[in-house]
């Protein structure tokens, strides 16, 4: 320091520890007070920003790095901090001093520090107040006595090389005594803490403070979740998690929710708990994610992506890096132990980030989960497992996840990805298929009331045959079974034809031969299912079978409706009790994911896979619905909408023309999704309320069934209406329980379905023709096919009510052409945008009666 001051080089003191200050305030010294308890990422980025600010050739003094171990609970993250900070200091031609307590850290951590630093020196103090200095690494320096121990005399301020045998023996005796007194340095401080906690538990001296520390450092950072974990967890629960953990850090929201829910059921409903499958999950701690970033030199781009300007723009590059990184040998060894444990049982690698499944933010479907068939040699299984981990890590850069974080004010919050590794619940069918009998999602409180007689507080199940992906994704022509738990047999479809049509036609299964998820016709599973599983999942179409018998044909006509499970009162009662218990324990509505496997005599087991607080629609005050003239009504619907009660003026109406969308070639149908995304971005932060009308299902993965938007494409809209068109085969689905619906709820986006042949539905598609068409102002004149989109030409002038017939009118005239071979015109009005801000167009929705009206009322806004 004296030399730096003499050279007039700035001295920067990074102050973050509880020990006495190493540098006193004085001219030429800048002191920064830092808080490592904000977390590794926030702390590390703050330090880097300060280093950038101070510039080149500065001198730095850091507090003792060992204090970071206490703040972050593990040596690993302290080592990671040094590995990303030291090279940056070197890059700026600085001099930096980092003290660390010898003997308090694992050999592995010190080895990483030694590999990174340019100079490493051991310092010892003797009882005689002599100081011994032992250089361990001197980069680009060498002398014959450099790496011998040296003695420094505080009295004479002289340094002597220990070449004398007597002097050297004193030093080695001192070093040996310290080594014997140090803790086991073959283990991390994390492991030493848990070993001590288990020892205290066996001796009956474990304290509540130690349990709290285990919760805080390993289970969750969510304050509400922490309180519940401490209320329900026993010490052995913490130890069990640690024994199944790879690395250090937090296990994340999804893992925490699953464990907590199972513990609540175990303690509060032992009868229900007997029907739960035991779990033997593993957890990849959140620190492994950061270590992966550091080990693959991705930290710099991570910092760029964390910035406001790079949050979206830098994501693709970081995602690419995450997909192509490699894991340290010690982590790969732990991965192999997991695979050895599971043998050849299929497993799934699930995201379990800091922010997932907590109060206020569900992150439903934002991050990936990857199934592993777990077949082949150990090397093949390890490659597949590592690939799955990389994919989930990379999904943190998914556009929908980033948009969700930005919309909910989470873009500046620390987000680490932990992982939950679970055995896939199910049975083998034939030689290659694996799946549960059924799976789905459940809600302790349902706002989807297709009948006034249903009790929302009784809860609801969304149930499919096979893997549960069909229950949470909007796919092709599949309709999950909806079960209101107060009236399990109540259905929206009354005729056999409707029951058959609006049922599940395809199932997701794990193909062990192809080692991937595959979709198959659900009827192909009927012959593979044992009789008791058939009875649980499949239902006979008695009407169709009767017609066949009249023709002399005797064969069953089946469709998948999970009717047998709906009729199983023990199952529906158990699920109702489970959901109500979890809601009571959470003191908040919840939703769950689960599987069901059935056996003989109506026996069954349920695997509780996930539980999280449910973002519930609030009814608010009762809305007085206006009585509008028919010519002033755009649409009115009952029992076909979702969203909180509201009276909202509408500034913009966006319409996807059903005829042109139908005629659009399959490969170019994503045009509509792209254009909707452009409209969504155009009106971001403008304060304008935009209402979107689309044919069929919004957000489906099958473009022929609807527009395949992601949530990021509609995140700024006020409302969305799905429009039925039987001629084109477009049919809305009120997908309560899908990930997209959860996004709409959290974003407070209204959803309505304009169904056909319903007495309580009125819809006038020509209504928007009276408004000004502003498509040309909002959308580009063309969207080129080279980007995977069809060309789209917009009108050259605003359209009034007396202008050329709109796309809506053209659709009406051309309705007879649906299903016929009609050429698709590349230049067409696929999406139209109408300015309604100067009118009194308003949406009224009353959640209590589930009634919506959209239309004009004079002077509404005055």
Predicted regions: what is each one?
Residues 239-303, 309-311, 316-329:
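A conserved helix-loop-beta module that forms one wall/lid of the active-site cleft
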Residues 140-178:
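C-terminal regions of RecA-like/P-loop NTPase motor modules
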Residues 101-155:
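Phosphate-binding/switch region of NTP-binding enzymes
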Residues 103, 220-221, 225-228, 232-271, ...:
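Conserved mixed alpha/beta core segments that line enzyme active sites in large multi-domain catalysts
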Residues 1-49:
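Conserved P-loop
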Residues 54-74:
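Conserved P-loop NTPase "ATPase switch" module shared by AAA+ and STAND
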Residues 71-72, 77-104:
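Substrate-engagement module of ASCE P-loop NTPases
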């Amino acid at each position: 320091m004296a030399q730096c001051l003499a050279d007039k080089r700035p001295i920067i003191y990074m102050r973050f520890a509880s020990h006495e200050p190493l540098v006193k305030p004085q001219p030429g010294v800048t002191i920064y007070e830092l808080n490592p308890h904000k977390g590794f990422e926030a702390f590390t980025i703050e330090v880097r920003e300060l280093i950038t600010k101070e510039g080149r050739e500065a001198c730095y003094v850091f507090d003792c790095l060992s204090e970071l171990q206490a703040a972050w609970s593990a040596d690993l993250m302290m080592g990671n901090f040094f590995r990303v900070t030291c090279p940056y200091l070197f890059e700026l031609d600085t001099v930096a001093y980092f003290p660390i307590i010898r003997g308090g850290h694992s050999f592995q951590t010190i080895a990483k520090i030694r590999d990174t630093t340019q100079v490493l020196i051991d310092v010892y103090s003797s009882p005689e107040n002599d100081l011994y200095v032992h250089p361990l690494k001197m980069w680009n320096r060498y002398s014959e006595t450099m790496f011998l121990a040296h003695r420094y005399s505080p009295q004479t301020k002289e340094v002597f090389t220990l070449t004398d045998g007597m002097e050297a023996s004193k030093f080695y005796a001192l070093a040996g005594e310290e080594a014997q007194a140090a803790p086991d340095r073959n283990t991390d401080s994390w492991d030493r803490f848990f070993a001590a906690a288990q020892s205290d538990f066996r001796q009956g001296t474990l304290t509540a403070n130690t349990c709290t520390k285990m919760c805080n450092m390993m289970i969750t950072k969510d304050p509400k979740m922490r309180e519940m974990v401490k209320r329900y967890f026993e010490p052995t629960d913490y130890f069990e998690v640690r024994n199944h953990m790879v690395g250090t850090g937090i296990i994340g929201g999804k893992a925490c929710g699953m464990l907590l829910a199972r513990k609540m059921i175990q303690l509060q409903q032992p009868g229900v708990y007997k029907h739960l499958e035991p779990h033997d999950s593993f957890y990849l701690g959140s620190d492994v994610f950061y270590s992966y970033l550091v080990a693959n030199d991705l930290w710099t781009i991570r910092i760029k992506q964390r910035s406001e300007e790079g949050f979206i723009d830098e994501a693709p590059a970081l995602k690419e890096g995450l997909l192509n990184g490699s894991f340290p040998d010690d982590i790969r060894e732990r991965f192999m132990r997991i695979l050895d444990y599971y043998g050849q049982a299929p497993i799934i690698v699930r995201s379990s980030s800091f922010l997932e499944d907590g109060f206020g933010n569900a992150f439903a479907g934002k991050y990936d989960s990857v199934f592993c068939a777990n077949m082949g040699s150990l090397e093949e299984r390890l490659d597949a497992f590592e690939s799955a981990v990389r994919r989930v890590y990379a999904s943190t850069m998914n556009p929908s996840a980033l948009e969700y974080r930005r919309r909910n004010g989470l873009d500046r919050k620390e987000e680490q990805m932990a992982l939950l590794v679970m055995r896939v619940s199910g049975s083998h069918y034939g030689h290659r298929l694996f799946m549960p009998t059924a799976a789905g999602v459940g809600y302790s409180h349902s706002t989807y009331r297709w009948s006034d007689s249903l009790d929302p507080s009784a809860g609801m199940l969304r149930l499919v045959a096979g893997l549960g992906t069909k229950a949470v994704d909007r796919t092709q022509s599949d309709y999950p079974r909806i079960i209101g738990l107060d009236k399990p047999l109540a259905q929206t479809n009354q005729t056999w034809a409707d029951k058959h049509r609006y049922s599940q036609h395809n199932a997701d299964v794990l193909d062990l031969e192809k080692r991937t998820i595959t979709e198959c016709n659900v009827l192909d599973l009927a012959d593979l299912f044992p009789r008791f599983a058939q009875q649980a999942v499949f239902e006979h179409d008695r009407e169709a079978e009767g017609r066949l018998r009249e023709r002399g044909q005797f064969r069953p006509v089946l469709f998948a409706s999970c009717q047998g499970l709906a009729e199983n009162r023990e199952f529906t009662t158990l699920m109702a009790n489970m959901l109500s218990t979890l809601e009571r324990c959470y003191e908040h509505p919840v939703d769950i994911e689960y599987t069901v496997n059935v056996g003989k005599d109506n026996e069954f087991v349920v695997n509780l896979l996930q539980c999280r607080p449910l973002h519930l629609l609030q009814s608010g005050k009762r809305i007085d619905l206006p009585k509008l003239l028919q010519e002033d009504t755009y649409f009115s619907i009952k029992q076909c909408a979702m969203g909180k009660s509201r009276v909202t003026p509408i500034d913009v109406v966006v319409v996807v023309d059903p005829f042109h969308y139908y005629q659009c070639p399959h490969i170019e149908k994503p045009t509509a999704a792209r254009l909707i995304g452009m409209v969504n971005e155009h009106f971001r932060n403008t304060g304008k309320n935009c209402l979107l009308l689309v044919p069929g299902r919004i957000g489906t993965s099958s473009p022929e069934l609807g527009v395949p938007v992601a949530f990021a494409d509609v995140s700024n809209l006020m409302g969305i209406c799905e429009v039925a068109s039987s001629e084109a085969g477009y049919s809305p689905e009120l997908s309560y329980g899908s990930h997209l619906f959860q996004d709409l709820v959290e974003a407070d986006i209204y959803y309505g379905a304009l169904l056909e042949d319903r007495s309580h539905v009125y819809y006038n598609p020509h209504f928007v023709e009276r408004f000004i068409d502003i498509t040309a102002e909002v959308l580009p004149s063309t969207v080129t096919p080279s980007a995977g989109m069809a060309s789209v030409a917009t009108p050259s002038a605003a359209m009034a009510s007396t202008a050329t017939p709109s796309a809506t009118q053209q659709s009406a005239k051309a309705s007879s052409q649906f299903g016929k071979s009609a050429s698709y015109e590349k230049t067409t009005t696929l999406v139209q945008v109408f300015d309604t801000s100067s009118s009194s167009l308003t949406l009224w929705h009353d959640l209590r009666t589930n009634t919506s009206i959209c239309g004009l009322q004079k002077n509404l806004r005055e």
